[in-house]
Amino acid sequence: MNFALREFIFVFCSLISLITPSPAAERPFYQGKNVNFIINFAAGGPTDIEGRIVARHLAKHIPGQPTLIPQNMAGAGGVTGMNFLGEVAKPDGQTLGYFTGPYNHQMMRTPSLRIDLIKLPFIASIQGVTVCYIRSDVPPGIKKPTDIVKAERFRAGGLSYDSNKDLRFRLAFDILGLKYDYVTGYNSSNDARLAVQRNEIQYHDENIPGYRGVVEPQLVKTGIVTPIYYHDVFSPDGVLKSSPDFPELASFTQVYTQIFGKAPSGIKYEALKAANIASGNMGRVAMMPPGTPPQAVAALRQAFAALSKDEEFIGDAMKVMKFHPRFEIGEDGERLRQKVLQVSPELVDFVRQFVEQARK
């Protein structure tokens, strides 16, 4: 074989090897795999309902289209599922957590949380907006949001001392200077809402499905309660923004400014802001075990980005969840996460003391 022919064969074979993908390159990371989709609250609740809608539509956007298997892991206010993801789940890319309020627990240093959530890869979060309402017959009468500062002493109902719901409304009320009695321990917002209807308590707050689905048609339109504000929502840079889900309402900071002519300030407001980002902007969070392969993290982030534009998913969500899901993905989500996880030790200590004071 002469030199020219040998050179031609060598070049030809080299080109073939370059344009022919290897079996590994052809096979997506998730092809033929199952993904355990861990939901940190019990079946039938809001987290479970939303999580299962996400799982149903997410798989088709993951290269390789794995099978997503929802699994409820309730307990300790949602912390049991978080501990499982951080301590037990294998970092093989085949476990995805879909959690309510993880960063709120980290910020409050919940004793039962044994893991550092900053070590768990962030995938995406879904924003949740909470609307606060009070009975209209609280003396001397609540007809509009700014009337709240005129209210005589009333009873405000929550779920537990260290829940994000209770923390946020207590901080907001203190900032406004309201006179109220704190009642907590209701098993759910359904129970608290019934207590409002019976006038056992006069205040509660709920997320979009509960507000749009029940409170608005049954209590607002009948004049029983008046919505006063929704908890603040922030941009990834930490700037206050209006919620497109409630164009007819104002945020807490907007109502405060209308009443007092200036924006709120101080450590309670800083604590409220951090709690709102942790519980509102990052109300539901998808995350993975520490050490998960980067290609798995990237694939799922891309899948959530595609899911956020999936009209079929959005239609299902609007039908069941009563709102248009708004995602924080990638760098935007990371910036918000850092604002919560890197709050000052002084602020963390203040929040813990604030919660403990309520127990006494």
Residue spans of the language-model regions?
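A ligand-binding cleft/hinge motif common to bilobed small-molecule-binding domains
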Residues: 101-112, 166, 170-175, 203-263
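Ligand-binding clamshell of periplasmic/extracellular solute-binding protein-like
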Residues: 50, 54, 76-79, 93-106, ...
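An extracytoplasmic/periplasmic, membrane-proximal ligand-sensing/linker region
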Residues: 31-33, 221-228, 237, 247, ...
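Bacterial N-terminal signal peptides
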Residues: 6-18
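Extracytoplasmic "Venus flytrap"
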Residues: 37-52, 74-77, 157-164
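Sec/Tat signal peptide C-region and signal peptidase I cleavage site
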Residues: 20-24
